[in-house]
């Protein structure tokens, strides 16, 4: 039996106790390779690795990888913006201005020149950061939607092994019952009479 279950919904009239909390549930995990099924509440399928682990699609995994890349880019841009506006950034900027003033003493307005050099870059970085945040939000929405739509799960190792043991026990009991029925049907009626003969009344 393959450890792959699909979450399905059944009608209210078919609901059965949850395998975890015993409350009535309409959600059933079905394994076609068994076949095997067990009822569970929706809440137990969310962030519960001791019970089930979601089996996400390739599209979901690609979206998560893309989300991590965009998050890293966004963090680096945010860090650069923070450093530019921090005390250390301003101190560095002041010292660089003083160096330019001493080196270019003939320049009538060095501050204006410096501001025109740095301001477009800062503006460009802010625009890139804004676009990156929009991209991150869009990918995050996609990941959340794919996570919500996921219906495939695998049981935790201990849980799956207990299901396998239960299936084997049921199979052994079924085979034993069939064998007993076959032996009973193949028995000679006269032999049955001899085995189950009642004691006669003493003479």
Swiss-Prot record:
One GO cellular component, as annotated: cytoplasm
Pfam families: Vfa1
Biased composition (Low complexity): 110-120
Organism, as annotated: Saccharomyces cerevisiae (strain ATCC 204508 / S288c)
Function: VPS4-associated protein involved in trafficking to the vacuole.
Subcellular localization: Cytoplasm; Endosome
GO molecular function, one term: ATPase activator activity
UniProt keywords, alphabetically: Coiled coil, Cytoplasm, Endosome, Protein transport, Transport
Region span, Disordered: 99-125, 171-193
Miscellaneous section: Present with 967 molecules/cell in log phase SD medium.
Biased composition, class Basic and acidic residues, residue ranges: 99-109, 171-182
Presence of keyword Calcium: no
Signal peptide: none
Lineage of the organism: Eukaryota, Fungi, Dikarya, Ascomycota, Saccharomycotina
Example GO biological process: vacuolar transport
Protein name according to UniProt: VPS4-associated protein 1
